[in-house]
Every structure is written in C-alpha cells, then in structure tokens.
Amino acid sequence: MNSPLPNSYRSGPDDRGHFGLFGGRFVAETLMPLILDLEKAYAEAKIDPAFRAEMDGHLKHYVGRPSPLYFAERLTDHFGGAKIYFKREDLNHTGAHKVNNVLGQIMLARRMGKPRIIAETGAGMHGVATATLCAKFGLKCVVFMGAVDIDRQEPNVLRMKALGAEVRPVTSGAATLKDAMNEALRDWVTNVHDTFYCIGTVAGPHPYPMMVRDFQSVIGHEVREQIMQLEGRLPDSLIACIGGGSNAMGLFHPFLDDPEVAIYGVEAAGHGLSKLHAASIAGGKPGVLHGNRTYLLMDGDGQIQEAHSISAGLDYPGIGPEHAWLHDVGRVNFLSATDTEALDAFKLCCRLEGIIPALEPSHALAKVADLAPKLPKDHLMVLNMSGRGDKDLASVAEHLGGQF
C-alpha cells in the first residue's frame, strides 16, 4: 500500500485529519460536536501569542526545559562506532516526555472551560503527568488504567493518587492500554458537557494526532539547536521507541524534511514477531481503532488482537496514523526489539552510563546496540531517552529473577 510522495513530509494532516490513507476521525455521532469544538479551540490557541508565551513559561519553569542533550561516552566506547547522544526527556518534571503534551492539552481544557479531565494510561507516566497538571491548575482528574498495568506499575498508581487523581481500574479485554482507552472514550461520551479527554499519544481521532505531535515537537526543535551548538551540524540518525509513538514523533517531526537524517522507530517485538508482540507495523495491517485508521494487530476476521510487551507503555495493538503514513512513504525505518533485547539494553545503560532508563526507550537502545557498531565514529546518533526507569525496577527484577 503506497501513498504518493509529498513535497514536504511535515505538511500533514489535511483538513479532515488524513495522513495519506491513514488518520481521519471515526467517532460516535455524540462525540463529533466535541471533536469539532476541540479542533476550533486548538486552531485558535495555536496562533495566540499569549497561549504560546504561557506555555513556554511553564515548559521552562515547571517542566524544566530544555532537557539536556547528553553525550553517552561509555556506551559510545562500548559499541565502538557511532557517537551516541541521549535526549534526556527522563529529566523532565514527572520523569518522561508525556508532560510536554499534557501541559498543552490542560491549557486548552482551561481555555475551553472544561473542569474535569480524563486520561488513559499504560505505563502510568501519562496518568502521572495529567494528575500533576490537574493538581497545578485545580482541575478534577480521572485516570483509566488497565488492571494488569496497575499491578506492574504500582509506583505510578501511588503517585497519581498522591496528586489527587481518581484511578479507575479497567478489567475488560486484556486489561491494558487499549482497554483503558476504550473506557475513557465511553466516559467522554457520557460526560460531554464538562469533560476534556487528554489523550497521551499521537493516536485517536483528528485533531489529536496532530495536536499531540505539535506539543511534543519541542523535543526535536531543541535537539536541532543543541546538536548544532555541540557538533556544528545535524545528526546523521535519530532513534526512538514507538508504542502509539508520541515521543518518537516529537523527535522526528522537525527533521522529516532533512533527507540526510536517517530515522528509526523501534516497536516492541515482545516474545518475538511470530509470537506475542506489540509491533503493529511489522505484524499488522490497516484498520480502524480509537477513532483513526492506522496499522493494527488484527486476526483474519478483523478483530483486534491483544498486544504484548514487557513495557506497559508499548503494549498497544496500534500505532499513530502519521507513523503509519511515514512507513508507507518510506521516510522512517521501523525496527523491533524483543523483551529480552530491551532488558539487556536496560542493564547496559544502568552499568555504563549511571542512567536507569524506562523499559520503553530500552527498546530503542537495543537497536542502537545493533546499529552503532557498524557505523563510523563520526556518525552522530540521537536516541530519545523518553523516560526514567524507576517505575520498572520491580518488573525488571521479577523478569531477571531478582538478579540485576
């Protein structure tokens, strides 16, 4: 399935929210007025200098941006090839990239006069970021989280509760991220008058994929500036993990029209691509889920299959529609890493860099381990260190039999 090559890879979506054959808005009739209101409010906010100035102020003084671009010297020496930089999104307030997007959406919710915020969460980082900003701005917060994820991400559940959020366990389906998103959408339909749905990734109906991408693009814009200061030129390659894909899109988007920059997205191969996994590009086909058309894990009857990853944040049977399009037009190379490869990369990063990475970016780091040794020493590679791994220590210890 090939989409025509565009003049610019950065111009999408069209006015109906399509990236080539992907995206759009497939939603219940009751939600359509909300979606259109949101689109209008975002279009107005985007060109309002006061909105931008307020957001920049919060990003600097509350989130702690810009996040550093860090030369991973010992990992670079260990692999003996490309010069590796980490974009340290793990150092943001709340410990991941999620807060960049949540800040923008919560500011939009306030602008729209919505006092109640709902969110879905997998690894808990989007839930924590949402609970954090609801506390800061005095808004009611309800977070939907799969029961399986509640068990494996307990530290984040406690953080959300400490911040005043109500955490609602979801027991339907596989009780993970997809199911949490289903429940959040149901709640939104029921409470349209006062509720804003803060989606955590570049998925959902238009304008969410575009809006989340725009709020996360601060990552890539900072990298452009920082790498020019450090190296005097653009990087040769970018690499990031992909579940829905917001951290990756935030890094990739500002570089899409730079043909000299190779771009790699890393999906979760779970137990392997022939077994249980969460690699929608590698093992999926086009379909509709959560309001947009994209690559999905489906059976022969078109039913959504359960995804699996050791990482709760990548455990989703779809991918953002813009990523699906970028795959089809050949601009982004999609790879996948297994649970075991991610665990090995996790341990390596801890021991060589003194950085405990989240299991999500550990998948990207696993592919750095494959790519970097084959590249020349002057090749500049930037990995998005999208979150810190405190939340994963119990899960990692369990998988490693307690032996770090």
UniProtKB/Swiss-Prot annotation:
Keywords for this protein: Amino-acid biosynthesis, Aromatic amino acid biosynthesis, Lyase, Pyridoxal phosphate, Tryptophan biosynthesis
SUPFAM superfamilies found in the cross-reference section: Tryptophan synthase beta subunit-like PLP-dependent enzymes
Residue list for modification N6-(pyridoxal phosphate)lysine: K98
UniProt catalytic activity: (1S,2R)-1-C-(indol-3-yl)glycerol 3-phosphate + L-serine = D-glyceraldehyde 3-phosphate + L-tryptophan + H2O
PROSITE patterns on file: TRP_SYNTHASE_BETA (PS00168)
Pathway: Amino-acid biosynthesis; L-tryptophan biosynthesis; L-tryptophan from chorismate: step 5/5
Gene Ontology MF: a single term: tryptophan synthase activity
Organism domain of life: Bacteria
GO cellular component, one term: cytoplasm
EC number: 4.2.1.20
Assembly and oligomerization: Tetramer of two alpha and two beta chains.
Similarity-based family: Belongs to the TrpB family.
Function, in words: The beta subunit is responsible for the synthesis of L-tryptophan from indole and L-serine.
Protein name: Tryptophan synthase beta chain
Organism whose genome encodes this protein: Rhodopseudomonas palustris (strain BisA53)
Lineage: Bacteria, Pseudomonadati, Pseudomonadota, Alphaproteobacteria, Hyphomicrobiales
Gene name, Swiss-Prot/TrEMBL: trpB
